[in-house]
Amino acid sequence: MCEKSQTIKELLNAIRTLVVKNNKAKVSMIEKELLAFVSELDKKFKQQLNNFNELQQKIPLLQKANEEFALKFERMQREAQNQIQAKLDELNLKNKKELEQAKKYAIAKTLDQPLNIIDQFEIALSYAQKDPQVKNYTTGFTMVLDAFSRWLEANGVTKIKIEPGMEFDEKIMSALELVDSNLAKNKVVRVSKSGYKLYDKVIRFASVFVSKGNKKS
């Protein structure tokens, strides 16, 4: 009985020893796993810390880039506004000039009748030199003609001065006919109807006879 009890005790001790050994092995395995996990966490933490440090180093560069972009955008915006304003000023100036030009030359449409009246008086005065009966009215005709001329000049209308012998100029003259003359070719022989300008614009071309330049004395 005593031997059996001893054997059982030994067996129990062996089993207990085996369990303890197995537990230690299990604890050691768990400890290793924990250490590996902690080591991995430490690596990841250090990596994140490095990333954070790199980001902190980049922040001033990013801030500088942001400031430079803001300044560039502000400069571009200012230049765009200046260009737009310049274009508006140009359009306003153009419209103003066009309006002034329109006002300046608006009277041109109303000048036909006054110019025709002047033509009639000039014709009458030219005949007055030849007809004694009409010559008595010369003073009155001249006064009316002068009054019309002053009114026209006050409104920017001037007669184009053309004399026989002048070179024909298509910019201010209209040729009625080419005629035989002692004058050189392309010279004005006679003015049939006076031409007029409104400021610097021709509103009526002078009607003239032009020399062929082939008449022999």
Swiss-Prot record:
It is found in: Cytoplasm. Pfam families: GrpE. The keyword Chaperone applies. Keywords: Chaperone, Cytoplasm, Stress response. Its main location: cytoplasm. GO terms for biological process: protein folding. GO terms for molecular function: adenyl-nucleotide exchange factor activity; protein homodimerization activity; protein-folding chaperone binding; unfolded protein binding. It comes from the Bacteria. One of its GO terms (cellular component) is cytoplasm. Belongs to the GrpE family. Homodimer. This is Protein GrpE. The gene is grpE.
